C-alpha cells in the first residue's frame, strides 16, 4: 500500500502544482486512496519532497532528481532563490530564508560540500552554520554570496 501511495504521490506532483499537504491529501482521495494528514506528512518526509517555485510564482511540491549533476544544480537554484540574507558572527553563519524554505536551503548548503562547514541546523526560515574558525565563517559567506550572484538572483 505504501509503495503504491508513494508512486501516486510522485505521479500527482509531476502532473499538478500541489502547494499544500491538504491539496495532496485531497488529490489522493480523488484517486481512491484514503489518507490522513499525518500520513501525508510522513510520506513527504520519506520521499524527501521539497518545495520549489512554480511557473505561476507559487511554491509547489517536487521530487529531488536522482541525477547528481541535475541535483546539485537544482539545489543551488533552491538555495539562491530562497535565501534572504547571509551574515557571519564569530565562527557562525546565519542564513535567513523565505518562510518554510529553511530545510530545503540547508539541504542545498550541505550539498555544496564547503569544507569550512562543521555542521548546519535548519529551522523554518533560519539556518545556523558552524564553521571551525571565524575566518572560515567569513569564507562561507563569500562563497554563498557568489552562488547567489551566479544564479542571477
UniProtKB/Swiss-Prot annotation:
It comes from the Bacteria. GO terms for biological process: L-arginine biosynthetic process; protein complex oligomerization; regulation of arginine biosynthetic process. It is found in: Cytoplasm. Pathway: Amino-acid biosynthesis; L-arginine biosynthesis [regulation]. Pfam families: Arg_repressor, Arg_repressor_C. InterPro entries: Arg_repress (IPR001669), Arg_repress_C (IPR020899), Arg_repress_C_sf (IPR036251), Arg_repress_DNA-bd (IPR020900), WH-like_DNA-bd_sf (IPR036388), WH_DNA-bd_sf (IPR036390). This is Arginine repressor. It comes from Clostridium tetani (strain Massachusetts / E88). The lineage of its organism: Bacteria, Bacillati, Bacillota, Clostridia, Eubacteriales.
Amino acid at each position: 500500500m505504501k509503495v503504491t501511495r508513494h508512486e501516486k504521490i510522485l505521479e500527482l506532483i509531476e502532473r499538478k502544482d500541489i502547494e499544500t499537504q491538504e491539496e495532496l491529501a485531497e488529490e489522493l482521495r480523488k484517486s481512491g486512496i484514503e489518507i490522513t494528514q499525518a500520513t501525508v506528512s510522513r510520506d513527504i518526509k520519506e520521499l524527501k519532497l521539497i518545495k520549489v517555485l512554480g511557473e505561476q510564482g507559487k511554491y509547489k511540491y517536487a521530487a529531488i532528481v536522482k541525477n547528481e549533476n541535475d541535483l546539485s544544480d537544482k539545489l543551488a537554484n533552491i538555495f539562491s532563490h530562497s535565501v534572504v540574507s547571509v551574515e557571519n558572527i564569530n565562527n557562525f553563519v546565519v542564513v535567513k530564508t523565505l518562510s518554510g524554505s529553511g530545510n530545503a536551503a540547508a539541504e542545498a548548503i550541505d550539498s555544496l560540500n564547503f569544507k569550512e562547514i562543521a555542521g548546519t541546523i535548519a529551522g523554518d526560515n533560519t539556518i545556523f552554520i558552524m564553521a571551525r574558525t571565524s575566518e572560515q565563517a567569513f569564507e562561507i559567506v563569500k562563497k554563498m554570496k557568489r552562488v547567489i550572484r551566479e544564479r542571477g538572483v
